[in-house]
UniProtKB/Swiss-Prot annotation:
Catalytic activity: [protein]-peptidylproline (omega=180) = [protein]-peptidylproline (omega=0)
Positions that bind Ni(2+): C167, C169, C185, C187
UniProt-annotated stretches for the region PPIase second part: 129-151
Protein name: FKBP-type peptidyl-prolyl cis-trans isomerase SlyD
Length: 190
């Protein structure tokens, strides 16, 4: 079966930055399962998978424009420390969901300067070329429900990220409307 729109595809993969740093992977015994053609992966990877078949192995370089976008200085802001009410001790690297005019935006603390905190709302892989090594492990027709919802339902789907654009940031919610992540953030796990 060819990979095309409305096909549920299982892939094993590794993704590295242009510097060769491994940022995420899904081994063949725990593949990533997604619905093709519904923007559940970074655009460049989904395009590269189109037309492939089970058993195909390939490598693809995804430019920022078809990955997580360009890095934007406008996404970096200084905010008063007191906006983090309820957090006992702030540390560089902490992740939160910031309430904005456009809705919640994931941010990471990059600097603490007295009573001010610098937060960065860019995706951690923004501005980076990504190098994927991929194998198509399985493919099947999607159910009508999966097509209607735009994502896979089942045992091997990953729902770490509502947008399905690859960042398995995890985290837990605090009562003060921020999300804080103790772990790392890869670009694959949906």
């Amino acid at each position: 079966m060819k990979v095309e729109k409305n096909v549920v595809v299982s892939i094993s993969y590794q993704v590295r930055t242009q510097d060769g740093v491994l940022v995420d992977e899904a081994p063949a015994n725990q593949p990533l399962e997604y619905l093709q053609g519904h923007n559940n992966l970074v655009i460049g990877l989904e395009k590269a998978l189109e037309g492939k078949e089970v058993g195909d192995k390939f490598e693809v370089r995804v430019q920022p424009e078809e990955g997580y976008g360009a890095y934007s200085e406008n996404m970096v802001q200084r905010v008063p420390k007191d906006v983090f009410q309820g957090v006992d001790e702030l540390e560089v690297g902490m992740r939160f969901l910031a309430d904005t005019d456009i809705g919640p935006v994931p941010v990471v603390i990059t600097e603490i300067d007295g009573d001010e905190v610098v937060v960065d709302g860019n995706h951690m892989l923004a501005g980076q070329e990504l190098h994927f090594t991929v194998e198509v492990v399985a493919a099947r027709e999607a159910t009508l429900e999966e097509i209607a919802h735009g994502h896979v339902h089942g045992a091997h789907s990953h729902d770490d990220d509502e947008e399905g654009h690859g960042c398995g940031c995890g985290g837990h919610h605090h009562e003060h409307n921020h999300e804080h992540n103790h772990g790392s953030c890869g670009c694959g796990g949906h």
